Each structure stands twice: as structure tokens, then as C-alpha cells.
């Protein structure tokens, strides 16, 4: 059953105050009934630990069951909101990363990936992986397992192909979501909010997206060798590098999450120095960024991120120090 009245109420409230809405697909936080009814969707780490409900991002992009149910939900969302003028765009998932899943379904998908890449020719794979060394020759794709990176001197060609496979799973999942939405949303853009983990190789790999966005947290308990103010300002290169990385992909890009104050997840969670939030915002625009969103508007009253600051405090009305820095930059940028 798909129930929209609660979400309709939130969209209507935003519209009442002339706010445009970016709708997010909730694939990073599957409900508990899904994990219990279909435990095969859960990610299995290399050490055998199976992720479970109670956090987030525990469902595998390589799971056919999870994809099928996720796509059904997304299509219903798109049918409901695709022609809604209050919705300006969509964010897919949340901070989608490359998953290194050791679930049996992921292993089967990895073999299919290799069959396609090497045109069902096991000799071609053996030649590419150099398996003649150390008697690693395979006679069938069915003999290949996911690489055990904890095992010393694992074949690095195999690891590289596995990382490419894992990146392709993330890219395909996002691309399919985007195509589903665009069937119904002709005047709404679609993006996602990547964490700039450049080495994972998946950023920009979903061509259906209209543009790319990134998430950036600057102050989280590491001064990164930039002086005594580093704990409260952050390293400006973190924004500058992200700007230079994202800008060439499609030209248009932005920041979907920029902290307005302390976070909850760092080793130390200091308040940004006065003026730091404003500095970060202008750094994004100076580097060519087209928009900035914040995470979050109101500090939550409960949950894992209870101590994550917002533009306003827990009472929902008192503007925080960082929140006050959003206002002048927003007005100046609009002019």
C-alpha cells in the first residue's frame, strides 16, 4: 500500500511559505518489514557480518528483489508528484556510494558482469587477469568468487574488476531510478548528492541525471594541518577540489548538503567559526556552483543525528549562528 497524505501535507506546508520542494527517493532507508520479509536484500560484509535494520544504507544495490520493490515505490512517487509544480526536482537516494557487498546475489551478479565484459570468453579473462601467475587459471566463470581483499596478495586485476562492478551497480541503480522518474516528470530535474569519494569511480557514471551534486561537511574534528583555526573553519581545499571535480562533468552542479553548524558524527564536533559558513557558501559559488542546499533546516529532537545543528534550533524558530549566515548570502545571490 502506498500512502501519500502525510507527504502531501509536508509539500503543501512548504508551498504555503513559497518554498520549492526537492523530492528524495527513500532507497537509503528501507523499512523494517522489507528486511524481515526479504533478508536476502541485506548487505554482507567481507568478514561475514550482515547489515541489519536500525541504521541506514543496509540494502544491496545488487539485490534483484530490492531493486524491483524500490522501482515500484519510485514509480508511484513519480506518478503522484511528476506533474506537481511545487516540486522542482528530485534527489536520488542519499549520498549513494559504492557498496562492497559479499552477498551470494552480488557474487552471481559479479560473474554476469565478467561474462559480459569478456564476451563469455574465459580465456580472455585469464589473459587480462594474468592468471597464469601463481596457478590462478580459471576454466569457468562459475569458479570465480568475489575477491577476498583481506587475503594477502589477492590478484589485483580481479580486485580492479570487482571495484568496477561495484561502481556499475551504484550507477545502474541511480540511472534506472532517474529514467523511471522522467517517464512522469517532464519539467523536473533529477540529481543526487554524492559524497566526493573520488577514488570509488562512480561519480558521474549515471548519464540520465540532469546534473551532479555533492555533499560537503567542513568541520568535524580534524584540522588537517591548516592551523589553530582549522577545527572551526575546515580546509578550503575540500570545497575547491570538489568544485573542480564536479564542474567538468556536466557544467551545472551544486551542493545538496552544507552544514550550518556542528555535526553529530565527528571525533570532535565544534561550532564553525563566525563567518565560516558564509565563507563556504561563497567558495561554492566562486568555484562555479549553481546552488546550495543545507542539511538541515531544524535540529532534530531525536534520532541518530539529534545533535546535528540546523538553520534553526530544536524549537523550530530560533535561528542558529550558522543559520544567520545563510540569509545575507541568499539575498545577495538572488540579486
Annotate each PLM feature.
Residues 3, 31, 103-107, 320-323:
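Residue-level signal for threonine
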Amino acid at each position: 500500500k502506498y500512502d501519500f497524505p502525510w507527504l502531501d501535507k509536508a509539500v503543501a506546508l512548504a508551498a504555503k511559505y513559497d518554498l520549492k520542494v526537492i523530492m528524495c527517493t527513500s532507497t537509503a532507508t528501507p523499512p523494517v518489514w522489507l528486511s524481515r520479509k526479504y533478508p536476502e536484500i541485506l548487505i554482507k560484509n567481507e568478514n561475514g557480518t550482515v547489515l541489519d535494520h536500525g541504521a541506514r544504507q543496509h540494502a544491496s544495490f545488487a539485490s534483484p528483489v530490492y531493486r524491483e520493490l524500490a522501482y515500484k515505490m519510485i514509480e508511484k512517487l513519480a506518478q503522484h508528484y511528476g506533474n506537481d509544480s511545487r516540486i522542482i526536482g528530485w534527489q536520488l537516494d542519499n549520498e549513494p556510494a559504492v557498496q562492497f557487498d559479499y552477498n551470494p546475489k552480488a557474487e552471481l551478479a559479479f560473474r554476469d558482469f565478467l561474462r559480459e565484459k569478456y564476451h563469455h570468453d574465459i580465456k580472455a579473462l585469464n589473459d587480462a587477469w594474468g592468471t597464469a601467475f601463481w596457478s590462478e587459471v580459471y576454466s569457468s566463470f562459475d569458479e570465480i568468487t568475489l575477491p577476498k581483499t583481506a587475503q594477502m596478495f589477492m590478484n589485483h586485476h580481479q580486485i580492479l574488476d570487482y571495484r568496477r562492478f561495484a561502481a556499475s551497480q551504484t550507477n545502474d541503480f541511480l540511472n534506472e531510478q532517474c529514467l523511471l522518474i522522467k517517464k512522469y516528470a517532464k519539467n523536473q530535474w533529477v540529481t543526487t548528492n554524492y559524497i566526493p569519494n573520488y577514488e570509488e569511480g562512480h561519480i558521474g557514471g549515471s548519464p540520465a541525471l540532469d546534473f551532479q551534486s555533492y555533499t560537503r561537511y567542513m568541520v568535524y574534528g580534524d584540522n588537517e594541518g591548516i592551523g589553530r583555526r582549522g577545527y572551526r573553519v575546515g580546509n578550503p581545499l575540500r570545497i575547491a577540489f570538489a568544485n573542480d571535480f564536479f564542474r567538468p562533468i556536466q557544467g551545472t552542479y551544486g551542493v545538496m548538503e552544507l552544514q550550518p553548524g556542528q555535526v553529530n558524527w565527528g571525533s570532535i564536533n565544534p561550532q564553525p567559526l563566525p563567518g565560516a559558513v558564509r565563507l563556504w557558501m561563497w567558495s561554492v559559488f566562486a568555484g562555479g556552483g549553481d546552488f546550495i542546499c543545507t542539511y538541515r533546516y531544524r535540529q532534530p529532537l531525536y534520532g541518530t543525528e539529534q545533535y546535528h545543528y540546523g538553520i534553526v534550533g530544536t524549537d523550530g524558530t530560533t535561528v542558529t549562528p550558522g543559520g544567520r549566515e545563510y540569509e545575507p548570502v541568499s539575498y545577495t545571490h538572488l540579486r
